[in-house]
Design a protein with these regions (language model features):
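Nucleotide-activated chemistry modules centered on ATP-dependent adenylation/adenylyltransferase
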Residues: 1-250
Length: 250
């Protein structure tokens, strides 16, 4: 009887990379690692640029040298496609869809979950999926589907800090951890202010694209997140810079 297929879900964050490193270290079966890249538009990744560079220039080559097959998935739809689409029913019918809702993200649904679901439909019955959930994330571990989803981090008693250290030792810790403790698209409405400040300071071209989208008329919502327009955040950072300049001049 053939063994089931084993795949690893990989965002190239510390937990999913540590899972793959543990699989290789302990001889756990692993047929391929699967990564879904959300795109801002047809040419620009939704990954924070430092993380995308790490994925393609460091992590994927390193894993391939270890013999890990990498599958990269992408949706035909992009963030800009969804943003500029039109509402088709209800009181806002005909308006530009605009920013995704926090907690009900159409980008997550259409650009990430659906490509993964299409991939999973072609997997053989009984496929086992390694999920990067650490030993100290008990609530998330309890939600794993028994037999079909496995945490190697829990199996080998690895906490999130252990995962960090394993990746760091292997030279596979993403540079995004220098300014955030979470993964996510650079246009995510759940992004914290330090993440947005990093985008503002280091990637003004991407920041400008978001301001261009904010300026589109006839949107179903003006809010980037639960409380602010993207232009409000832009004003906030400009004011911070102005105050800092005054302090330096004093």
């Amino acid at each position: 009887m053939e063994r089931p297929k084993f795949i690893a879900s990989c965002s190239f964050g510390k937990d999913s990379l540590a899972t793959i490193l543990l699989a290789k270290e302990h001889g756990e079966p692993l047929d391929e690692a699967v990564y879904c890249e959300v795109m801002f538009d047809k040419g620009i990744s939704g990954e924070v640029p430092e993380h995308r560079d790490f994925i393609y220039n460091t992590a994927i080559p390193a894993l391939e040298r270890m013999g890990v097959k990498i599958i990269v998935l992408r949706s035909e739809k992009t963030y800009v496609d969804l943003f500029t689409g039109r509402v088709t029913r209800g009181p806002k019918k005909g308006m530009v869809r605009s920013f995704p809702l926090c907690g009900k993200c159409a980008v997550q649904r259409d650009c990430k979950i659906r490509p993964i679901q299409r991939y999973q439909k072609n997997l053989p019955p009984g496929t086992v999926q390694y999920i990067g959930i650490a030993q100290d994330e008990q609530e998330r571990l309890l939600r794993l589907e028994s037999g079909r989803q496995v945490s190697l981090l829990a199996k080998y008693n690895f906490t999130e800090q252990d995962a960090w250290q394993l990746c760091e030792k292997a030279g596979l810790l993403s540079p995004v951890y220098a300014f955030t403790d979470r993964g996510g698209c650079w246009f995510c409405p759940n992004a914290k202010l330090p993440e947005l400040r990093h985008l503002y300071d280091h990637h003004p071209d991407l920041w400008a694209r978001m301001l261009e989208l904010q300026a589109i008329p006839g949107k179903a919502t003006e809010k980037f997140n639960r409380t602010q327009k993207f232009s409000d955040i832009d004003v906030l950072f400009r004011q911070e810079d102005g105050k800092a300049a005054l302090r330096q001049a004093a």
